C-alpha cells in the first residue's frame, strides 16, 4: 500500500523511531499465508499472532459462497466485520503491550484504518499518550442520510467514532470530510489531506524497446493505454476492456497494459477472451514502482474508470508524468480532470464514448500533446510525499509536546 509505505518512511525521515504492530496474516484477503516484510526496513515490526485469522478466513470464504455474485450476505457480513474488529482489537492491544514489555516506550499511538482504531485508543489510554487514527477512504458518504448508519456499518463508523486526539482522513474523493462532519468530529482534531506523489529520484530513461524486452507481451508498434490498479470489482477494468473492443472494431492498434493483480483477474481475463481482444491486453500483474514510472513515461494514454472514486495516487502520478487521461465523469475528480483540457471524459457506463475517446487519443498526436502539457501544469499543484509528510510530522510533534506539557502541569 503506497500511502502506508510513504507514511512510515515520512515518520522515520522526521527523526522518529517506529515500532509497527501488524497482524500475522492479512485480514482482508483469503490468503492463509503469513505476512512477510522485506528486510532492511527503517522501522521495527512486531507481529500479533492472530491465530484465529486462518479459520476466520475460511468461514468468510464459505459465507461468500452463500451470497450472490460471490458477496457475503449482509447479516453475515455484519457479524463477520464486527467479530474481526473486536478480535483485532484484542490481538493488537496484547501485542502492543508485549512490545512495551520488551522495552519500547511510545510517545504516541498511530492507528492505521478503522479496524485498528479501537486498539489504538485503548493502548494510548493505558500508556497515557495521545492517539491518532488514520483513515484511507470511506464508503459512508452516500449512506449518511439513512438511519442508524453507525449501527448498520459499525466497523466503517468506528474510525470516526472511536475517540482520538487527531483524525487524519485521506482526501481521495470518497468525501471523508462530509462523513466526519455528520458524525460530529471536531474540526480542531480533523485533518483532510490529499496524498503526496513520489516521483523517481532520477527520471525514467527506459525506451519502449527496453520495456518490450522486460515485458515480452508488449508490442512497440501499437499505442499503449495504461491502467494501474488492484483488480477489484469497483475498479471497473471491464469498462476499459469494452473501450478497447471499440478500438479493435475501428482497426486502431492499441494495447491495454494492466499493471496490478487482484480477485477479479480471472473474470477479467474471461471477459477479454469473450471480446476477442487476444494480445491487445497485457496482464502484467504486480509491477515494481520504478517500472510503473517507466510505463507512464512511455505510454500514450492513462485509463481510469473506477466506480467509487477516481481520485487516487495513480492519477496524481499520471499527471506528474504528463500522461493524458481517458476517464469517466466523476465528482471526486471534477477539480482535477477537465474534458478536453487534460482528459477526455464520458459517462460511467457509456462504453462506446469511452472507446471513441481512446480511439481519438491514439490517433491525434496534437490533442495528446495538448492534454499532456495540461497534465504537467496540474502536477505542479500537488504535494510531494516529502512535503505531505513534513506537514503531518509537524502536527504529530505538536500533539506530543502539548501532551507532555499537560503531563508536566498535571
Predicted regions and their residues:
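Short alpha-helical donor nucleotide-sugar binding micro-motif in glycosyltransferases
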Residues: 286-287, 294-299
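Short hydrophobic beta-strand element within catalytic cores of glycosyltransferases
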Residues: 324-327
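Conserved acidic donor-binding segment of nucleotide-sugar-dependent glycosyltransferases
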Residues: 339-340, 344-351, 360-365
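Membrane-proximal helix-turn-helix segments that form the acceptor-binding/catalytic region
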Residues: 5-9, 93, 97-100, 139, ...
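Aromatic "clamp/platform" in nucleotide-sugar-dependent glycosyltransferases that forms part
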Residues: 307
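A short, active-site helix/loop in glycosyltransferases that binds the activated sugar's phosphate group
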Residues: 160-201
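Conserved donor-binding/catalytic core segment of Leloir-type glycosyltransferases
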Residues: 168, 217-235, 241-244
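N-terminal subdomain of nucleotide-sugar transferases
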Residues: 1-49, 104, 404-409
